[in-house]
Amino acid sequence: MAAGALRGLPVAGGGESSESEDDGWEIGYLDRTSQKLKGLLPIEEKKEKFKKAMTIGDVSLVQELLDSGISVDSTFQYGWTPLMYAASVANAELVRVLLDRGANASFEKDKQTILITACSAHGSEEQILKCVELLLSRNADPNVACRRLMTPIMYAARDGHTQVVALLVAHGAEVNTQDENGYTALTWAARQGHKNIVLKLLELGANKMLQTKDGKMPSEIAKRNKHHEIFNLLSFTLNPLEGKLQQLTKEDTICKILTTDSDREKDHIFSSYTAFGDLEVFLHGIGLEHMTDLLKERDITLRHLLTMREDEFTKNGITSKDQQKILAALKELQVEEIQFGELSEEIKLEISGDEFLNFLLKLNKQCGHLITAVQNIITELPVNSQKITLEWASPRNFTSVCEELVNNAEDLSEEVCKLKDLIQKLQNERENDPTHIQLREEVSTWNSRILKRTAITVCGFGFLLFICKLTFQRK
């Protein structure tokens, strides 16, 4: 093998590497004057030229060398074929040429398939999608796993390639296959924070309840990696599109998943909201839709369900397993309360700086949750009263409560402003006290920021409630 071989060819997906340090791929400038093959060249020289042409992506020279007798499935010291290398750099044009010349799309090296290599390639999703589509058109199996039991769809989900994921499923890829650690494609997408892929996988029938080997569901994996929006999506709400494409033919699925469907999803979300009552929406969201008829027969409303005691659950025929789901969902909806009663009298009189800062942080966090809740309600409420099909009481009752909320928010804003002024006064006195040792400026600045954020959050919450009030009055 030539001495100028490339070291460090792109490693196979999943972190698998070859024991050989010399893969046989040579990188360097290819002299264009040597590209025209005059007569027969020694086979080793042809191979070297072939490797150079592959490295720089010279399609015309690759074709010329293949015409001169180089095998399209020739392997080099690393063990990769030309097609595998072309797939690893997402060179769709080279992949097409090699496949047209008869390259084996199902080749694998140490459980590393060409399709896996393409799905984990470094390149644009457009080029990766083209490569994957070409390989699938030549009957590459989308369910063959690597040594770590990861399938192509897992690599595509991990790397954030939504269209590739959908295309693989359309060609028969199993959505709920698990790797050696129990990860599914959905788990990988949740771990990496790819919201669009999470939604697409749910639409394609992914099971969000499958656990990893250490007992974690995708929602918990998302939470552990601080992807809170995905955590909320997977842990509480049920995607209205879940499993929608499972029963379609391959042709219909390919047509649907490769077209823009934003308008369709908006229409679906709206119709889902208005077609069910609040009780049905809640039960469907926590996977208890089978209880709908039972609760309706007993005239149990959502408000009644959420305030039931344990004996009432049993009396109405709700099993302990279903009770746990309802209570868990209710717990998710509750805002954490600050227990002042747990503080000793001494701390109440002379609270420490850390405890006071913790109090402000909790207060700010709760205000943020309240603002988000009001924003979600404003977004979800239909603008036309004729489209409301839920069981609603008189809107006057809602307006009255909103007025009380606005008043309370205004009172809270006023009290926080008083608190801020008091703390500012204390801070000024401490700074002017010659006997006081100054704290680091950074700490002072941080505390000031917390106070400002708290005040702004409270004022913002009051403003949102005011808007909510106006909305109800208009309706």
Curated annotation (Swiss-Prot):
Gene3D superfamilies: Ankyrin repeat-containing domain, Transcription Factor, Ets-1. One of its GO terms (biological process) is spermatogenesis. It is found in: Cytoplasm. Keywords: ANK repeat, Cytoplasm, Developmental protein, Differentiation, Meiosis, Phosphoprotein, Repeat, RNA-mediated gene silencing, Spermatogenesis. InterPro entries: Ankyrin_rpt, Ankyrin_rpt-contain_sf, Asz1_SAM, SAM, SAM/pointed_sf. The modification Phosphoserine is found at S17, S18, S20. Residues 272-334 form the SAM domain. ANK repeats lie at residues 45-74, 78-107, 110-144, 148-177, 181-210, 214-243. SMART domains: ANK. Interacts with DDX4, PIWIL1, RANBP9 and TDRD1. PANTHER family: ANKYRIN REPEAT, SAM AND BASIC LEUCINE ZIPPER DOMAIN-CONTAINING PROTEIN 1. This is Ankyrin repeat, SAM and basic leucine zipper domain-containing protein 1. It comes from Papio anubis (Olive baboon). The lineage of its organism: Eukaryota, Metazoa, Chordata, Craniata, Vertebrata. The gene is ASZ1.
